[in-house]
Amino acid sequence: MANLTETAYYTRRTINWSILAVISYIVLRFFWSVFVAVWLEIFPPKPPPPNFRFGKLPALKFSEASPSAQFTYRLETIVGNVPVASESAAVYFMPKPAANLLALSRTQDFATRLGLDPSPIEETKSVYRFEDVTAPLRRLRYDIVSNNFILRYGFEQDTGLFSDRNIPGVDAAIAEGKAMLQTFALYGTDLSQGTSKVSFLKLVGDKLLGTTSLSQADAVRVDFFRKNVSGMRLFPPNPDEGQAVFVFSGSKNEKKKILQIAYTLWPIDYETQGTYALKPSSTAWEELQAGRVYIARYPTSAATNVVIRQVYLGYYDSFDPQMYLQPVFVFEGDYGFLAYVPAVAPEWVE
């Protein structure tokens, strides 16, 4: 009897100690995980040294020179100064599409599917125009090498089409744009994993200008933006313009319903990349102040003193072909101001 009591006693103690050990392990593991996370946040491991795989990079070519000398800048970030940026970043190869003997034939098929006359009109060695015999204001310009194109209906000469008010809402416009991209095999992961934005347009004279609501709109615009790369956003020359853009009217006529499709998407080889040293963010700030900057969006205010609220890294995705996807410092300020400064260390740019 004593042996049974003693056995039960030690069994209970063993169970209690086992439970305590398990609880202690869970608690200790939790606190260790928190400690490691906090430690890495405060003392992050240094990234591997840059490999400068492509040698010296060609200088970024921005769309046009921007007159920035008229502005003076004041820094008012959350931290009170220019945030310290990473010492290096990835640079990606952007392969140049090769000419293809079947390219023109495929483009003619594309034009036919859009309801255009497949007879090409040569504008340059790579750019062809296609007309619509039943809707003369509608035409397609297509680059058979890059596969970038713009389809447009000249609404300026036919403003009566806006009397129809069957304008798609936000969700319908996104769905319609997405469906068209999928139909023509243009909705790859670069766009499908990216973001979209809808804006409303109102006819003023013969121009479509931004307005605040669907009820006031004569057309709706959908911009599809490329996905982030290495956790950083891609910035076109115009940060409000996506790589794929649709403008829909409310017309019941199918050929007047789509006022514009603009598609400009240069390929990125995500498997071919190098790492490059970056200039300090403080140096980028000095270049901004000195006017060595591309202003992508001017402030809506007439003031010439711009307050900078955010400074961070992104990638510049030009509408013109460039050999490499390179990082830039992005400066965001009051009243919509946005500017880019090349980020790669100057000794690695030519």
Regions found by a protein language model. Give the residues of each.
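Activation/maturation switch segments at domain boundaries
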Residues: 2-4, 306-307, 312-350
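Charged, low-complexity helical/coil segments in non-catalytic cytosolic or luminal regions
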Residues: 185, 190-194, 217, 225-226, ...
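Generic structural hydrophobic/aromatic packing signal, biased to beta-strands
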Residues: 31, 151, 177, 222-224, ...
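Preferential activation on post-signal-peptide N-terminal prodomains/segments
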Residues: 1-211, 221-224, 230-236
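Sequence-level detector for tyrosine residue identity
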Residues: 9-10, 25, 73, 92, ...
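A short, surface-exposed beta-strand/turn
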Residues: 139-155, 233-262, 330, 336-350
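A short local loop/turn or secondary-structure capping micro-motif enriched for an aromatic residue
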Residues: 159-160, 268-270, 348-350
